[in-house]
Amino acid sequence: MKKSLLLLLTLLLLGLNATSSFAKTDKPNILVIWGDDVGMYNISAYHRGMMGGSTPNIDRIASEGALFTDGYAQQSCTAGRSSFVLGQHPFRTGLLTIGMPGAKDGISDKDPTIAELLKNHGYVSGQFGKNHLGDQDHHLPTAHGFDEFFGNLYHLNAEEEPESEFYPKDPEFHKKFGPRGVLHATADGKIEDTGPLTKKRMETADKEFLAASLDFIERAHKAGKPFFVWHNSTRMHVWTHLSPEYKGKSGYGLYADGMMELDDGVGVLLDKLDELGIADNTIVVFSTDNGAEKFTWPDGGTIPFKGEKGSTWEGGFRVPMLVRWPGTVKPGTIVNDIFSQEDWLPTLLAAAGEPDVTKKLLKGHRANGKTFKVHLDGYDQTALLSGKGPGARDEIFYFDAGSNLNAIRYKDWKIHFTIMEGNISEAYRKSPSWPLIVNLRMDPFEDGPDSSMYVRDFYADQMWMFVPAQAVVGKFLATFEEYPQRQAGGSLSIDAVMDKMKAAASRQ
């Protein structure tokens, strides 16, 4: 009898402990893993063996969750990263231009990050690896809701510029215009410069960032806190400096070797979730900041789309995008609907228990000790991901780094009013006599305009869409009256955007 009572008491205590532990972590953890300039076809879940090189750990996210065919970012680093963490189009926040060492522009404290909004739900947030949202202390993630940051602030080739024989040797020049080192910062205002990100350090920097992400996850788990971790690998931005461990490992060249390193890191993160027993309560997202950079091949990515990073063809904006969300996303799902990086903020806030964050922010919403009044350009895509409804997004706006609106996509149709042609180092705008029209379900790689029969057999019958396209852009720009641009991202005003688009349409 005593043994039975003891057993019953033990079971009750175990049950109470389990319930107490679950209560602390009932909100889903969020792990967002980003590569840098990663090509869609450099991931084997996309290339399906067409190319050499495999990424079994990244593929695992797809097989246990969803793979997106129409996932969109922006045309370059800063724009793509800001759109994700702020949920606003970078034309609105003024973050379309690539952030540089010594620059004064960067993320504004008037725009809430995912980390700040998650504070209301008890989350701890860490960002590790590349940031690229501003050079100054007040731009650092820890000034914008993140509890900890360990990483670099710029694109890799900017980090190694001081090693050039032509780089000015004057210490004052470097102090004013040179890249800062790899920083370790915390929300209490402490900032430690751990030293420059040299070519040599680039060989193993991702291991440093990986260790920091793992440590943060473990500490959050032990504290019973839901976490948001944004882990940013340096792979595969140029120039790639591999450690001896990965040189020649794939048998398919430098890029595939680097992808093996990136994939191994993803595997370590996924294994950590399994080890801690929290994989079933963690949303995992994999993506990147912009379209692949192809002109530096073989130290460049591979994609099936026309164009590349810096252009306004699909190759500049479409990115690999995968999500594993146990209990919400059915394993093996293929998502063909339009999904943009801005959509993650309202979607993840809905997962945390706040599906109306967009409406709240329009009126004024308090988070992280501040009141924010902003217009989110992202949509809550929970219904799409859960299979309970259609996608919420119909449109994509293709702005370049100079704040020029070059093209729009509305549902299946894309209209190029102007085109950013070429690679990011020499891209130039060209204005076709008539705007180009592409049906992206018929012609996802935008080959049609190169066809000799394009005008006669397709284009001439589609000019009806010029005026409706202006209405779509007009609706977007109308929101700027109450929620204006945060800072000038270029020389083009909102009125000029509409004027140039109308002028392009009138040329037909």
Predicted regions: what they are:
Residues 2, 7, 18-435, 440, ...:
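Formylglycine-dependent sulfatase
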